[in-house]
C-alpha cells in the first residue's frame, strides 16, 4: 500500500490572502494577521499610559537607568561609574567701551589771491648763525569766479597736513560701443577693383622693374633729394589666409557600450585563430554574389544572398570551385559588418568546410572566416567660390612695356623754365595748368562690333563696317528685327540731283470696279431720321 504524501499546510498569511476577498476568513486567522488579539490590545492600550523607556531594562549594562539606583529610605541615587561634575566659579565678562574719538582740526582755506609770506620765528636755542629773514612772495594769476574746493586734513597735531585738491574740471569719460546684428535675408557684397600701388586687395601682385618706363619731372633741387626718404614696405596678411577646421564626424550612431557588448560574442567566433581559419578575399563578387565563388550555378535575380547558404555536394563527385579559397565549403553564413582598428569597414562571412566525411555520413571540417575590407570613401570636395569675384585678383605690371610714371608739380614751376616766359609769376606760366593731365589720344571705333544682350541669354553681335557712299548718312541693317546703326560720314562731294518731269500728275479715283463715270457728291441723297410723335 502506497503511503500518502504529506502535503504542507498553508501558512496564515496565504490563508488570509485567499479568504479576505471572499470574506470567509476564520476568526483566529483574521485576529492574528490584523493584530487584534487580546495580548495585542493590552500592549496597545497599556503603552499609551505607561512609559518604561530610559530605564535600561533588558540592556545588560546595570546602570539603573537615567537616575541610577536609589536605596530605600535614602535620598537621590548615585549613578554607577559616573564622572563627578566639577563646579567652577563664573567668569565676569569685561566691558568694552567705545574707542577714543580723535578730534579733527579744521584748517581755514587759503585765498589764492592773497600773497603767501612765511616768517621764521625765534627758537629757544642759541643760534650761532646770524638771524635770517626769508620772504617768499607768490604772484598768482588773477582769476574771476573760480570754484575752490575746501581741503580735507586728516590726522592729529603731530601729523603733517595733507592737502587734497580736486581738479575743478575733470575730464569727461566717454565710451563708444558698436553692435552689429547679422541678417541672413539681407547681404551686401562690397568689392572694389584693385589697383597696384593703391590698395593691396589682390593676392598676387607682381611688379617687374627694369630699364623701361618714363620718369618726367623729379626733384627741384639737391636739397629736396636729400629730404626724400625711403620707406620699407610691410607685408600685410592675405584676406584669404585662413584655415577651415572641420570637426571629425562620428563614425557610428550606436553607443560604444552597446556596440562592444553586441560584438563581443561575434569577435570570439570570428577571430579565434585556434578554432577559425582566417581567409582574406579580394574578389568583389564576395560582396554581392558569394555563391558564384563556391560553385558554378545560374544567377537568380530575385534571390538575395543576404542569408545563410548551404551547398550540397555529391560524395563521389569532385567539383572544383571557381575560387580555390572556397574549396569544400558547404555552409556560408550571412554577412556581418564591423570596423577594423584602422577605421575601415569589414564585411565578414562565417563558413564551414566539409573536408572529411565518415561512413556514417557525418562531415568533419574547420570553420573559416572570410572577410574583405572596403576602401576609404573620401568626402565630397566642394569648390569654394569667392563672393563678388572680379578680374583684378592678379595684377602684373611690366615696366618696360606697360608702366609710365609721370611726376609733374602743377603748383610750382620748374626752375629751368622760369624766365623763358613773358611773366615769371606762377599763375601766368603754362605749366601751372590742369590741361597737362588731359589725354591727347584719339580713339577710332571703325570696324568695331556691337553686342546686345546679357550674360544669361544669348548675345547678338552686329558688325559695323566702314564703306564709302555718295550720301551723307548711310544705314546698314543686318537683321529686320534688330537695331538700326547709323554711321554718319561727311565728304566734299557734289550732290547729285535726279531729273524730274514738269508735267503734273492727274489722279482719277474709281469707287466701283469697272465704272466709267464720277458721281458728284451733291447728287447723293442723304437719309434723314424721322421723328415720331
From Swiss-Prot:
Subcellular localization(s) per the UniProt record: Virion; Host nucleus; Host early endosome; Host Golgi apparatus
Highest taxon of source: Viruses
Main location: virion
Family (UniProt): Belongs to the papillomaviridae L2 protein family.
Alphabetized UniProt keyword annotations: Capsid protein, Cytoplasmic inwards viral transport, Disulfide bond, DNA-binding, Host endosome, Host Golgi apparatus, Host nucleus, Host-virus interaction, Late protein, Microtubular inwards viral transport, Phosphoprotein, Viral penetration into host nucleus, Virion, Virus entry into host cell
Post-translational modifications reported in the UniProt record: Highly phosphorylated.
One Gene Ontology biological process: microtubule-dependent intracellular transport of viral material towards nucleus
GO MF assignments: DNA binding; structural molecule activity
Job description of the protein: Minor protein of the capsid that localizes along the inner surface of the virion, within the central cavities beneath the L1 pentamers. Plays a role in capsid stabilization through interaction with the major capsid protein L1. Once the virion enters the host cell, L2 escorts the genomic DNA into the nucleus by promoting escape from the endosomal compartments and traffic through the host Golgi network.
Protein name per UniProt: Minor capsid protein L2
Disulfide bond annotation, renumbered to this chain: 19-25
Gene name linked to the record: L2
Residue ranges of the motif Nuclear localization signal: 1-10, 525-532
A GO CC annotation given for this chain: host cell nucleus
Assembly, per entry: Interacts with major capsid protein L1. Interacts with E2; this interaction inhibits E2 transcriptional activity but not the DNA replication function E2. Interacts with host GADD45GIP1. Interacts with host HSPA8; this interaction is required for L2 nuclear translocation. Interacts with host importins KPNB2 and KPNB3. Forms a complex with importin alpha2-beta1 heterodimers via interaction with the importin alpha2 adapter. Interacts with host DYNLT1; this interaction is essential for virus intracellular transport during entry.
Amino acid at each position: 500500500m502506497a503511503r500518502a504524501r504529506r502535503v504542507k499546510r498553508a501558512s496564515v498569511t496565504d490563508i488570509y490572502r485567499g479568504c479576505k476577498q471572499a470574506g470567509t476568513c476564520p476568526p483566529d486567522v483574521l485576529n492574528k494577521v490584523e493584530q487584534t488579539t487580546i495580548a495585542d490590545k493590552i500592549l496597545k492600550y497599556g503603552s499609551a499610559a505607561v512609559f518604561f523607556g530610559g530605564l535600561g531594562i533588558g540592556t545588560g549594562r546595570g546602570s539603573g537607568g537615567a537616575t541610577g539606583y536609589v536605596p530605600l529610605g535614602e535620598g537621590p541615587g548615585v549613578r554607577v561609574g559616573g564622572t563627578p561634575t566639577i563646579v567652577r566659579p563664573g567668569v565676569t565678562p569685561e566691558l568694552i567701551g567705545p574707542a577714543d574719538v580723535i578730534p579733527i582740526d579744521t584748517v581755514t582755506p587759503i585765498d589764492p589771491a592773497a600773497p603767501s609770506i612765511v616768517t621764521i620765528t625765534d627758537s629757544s636755542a642759541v643760534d650761532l648763525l646770524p638771524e635770517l629773514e626769508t620772504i617768499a612772495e607768490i604772484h598768482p594769476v588773477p582769476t574771476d569766479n573760480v570754484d575752490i574746493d575746501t581741503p580735507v586734513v586728516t590726522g592729529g597735531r603731530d601729523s603733517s597736513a595733507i592737502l587734497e585738491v580736486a581738479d575743478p574740471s575733470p575730464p569727461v569719460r566717454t565710451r563708444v560701443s558698436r553692435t552689429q546684428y547679422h541678417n541672413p535675408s539681407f547681404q551686401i557684397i562690397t568689392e572694389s577693383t584693385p589697383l597696384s600701388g593703391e590698395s593691396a586687395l589682390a593676392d598676387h601682385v607682381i611688379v617687374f622693374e627694369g630699364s623701361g618706363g618714363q620718369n618726367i619731372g623729379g626733384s627741384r633741387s639737391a636739397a629736396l633729394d636729400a629730404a626724400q626718404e625711403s620707406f620699407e614696405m610691410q607685408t600685410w596678411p592675405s584676406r584669404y589666409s585662413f584655415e577651415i577646421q572641420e570637426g571629425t564626424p562620428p563614425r557610428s550612431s550606436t553607443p560604444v557600450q552597446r556596440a562592444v557588448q553586441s560584438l563581443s560574442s561575434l569577435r570570439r567566433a570570428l577571430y579565434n585563430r585556434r578554432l577559425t581559419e582566417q581567409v582574406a578575399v579580394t574578389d568583389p563578387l564576395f560582396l554581392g554574389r558569394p555563391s558564384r565563388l563556391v560553385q558554378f550555378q545560374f544567377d537568380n535575380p530575385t534571390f538575395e544572398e543576404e542569408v545563410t547558404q548551404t551547398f550540397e555536394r555529391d560524395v563521389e563527385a569532385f567539383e572544383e570551385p571557381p575560387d580555390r579559397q572556397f574549396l569544400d565549403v558547404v555552409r556560408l553564413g550571412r554577412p556581418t559588418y564591423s570596423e577594423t582598428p584602422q577605421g575601415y569597414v569589414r564585411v565578414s562571412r562565417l563558413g564551414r568546410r566539409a573536408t572529411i566525411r565518415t561512413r556514417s555520413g557525418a562531415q568533419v571540417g574547420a570553420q573559416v572566416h572570410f572577410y574583405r575590407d572596403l576602401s576609404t570613401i573620401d568626402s565630397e570636395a566642394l569648390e569654394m567660390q569667392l563672393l563678388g569675384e572680379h578680374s583684378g585678383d592678379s595684377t602684373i605690371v611690366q615696366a618696360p612695356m606697360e608702366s609710365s610714371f609721370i611726376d609733374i608739380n602743377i603748383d610750382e614751376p620748374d626752375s629751368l623754365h622760369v624766365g623763358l616766359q613773358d611773366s615769371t609769376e606762377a599763375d601766368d606760366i603754362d605749366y601751372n595748368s590742369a590741361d597737362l593731365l588731359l589725354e591727347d589720344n584719339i580713339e577710332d571705333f571703325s570696324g568695331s562690333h556691337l553686342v546686345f544682350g546679357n550674360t544669361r541669354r544669348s548675345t547678338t553681335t552686329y558688325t559695323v563696317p566702314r564703306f564709302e557712299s555718295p550720301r551723307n548718312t548711310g544705314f546698314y541693317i543686318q537683321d529686320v528685327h534688330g537695331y538700326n546703326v547709323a554711321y554718319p560720314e561727311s565728304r566734299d562731294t557734289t550732290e547729285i540731283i535726279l531729273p524730274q518731269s514738269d508735267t503734273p500728275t492727274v489722279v482719277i479715283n474709281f469707287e466701283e470696279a469697272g465704272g466709267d463715270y464720277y458721281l458728284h457728291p451733291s447728287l447723293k441723297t442723304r437719309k434723314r431720321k424721322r421723328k415720331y410723335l
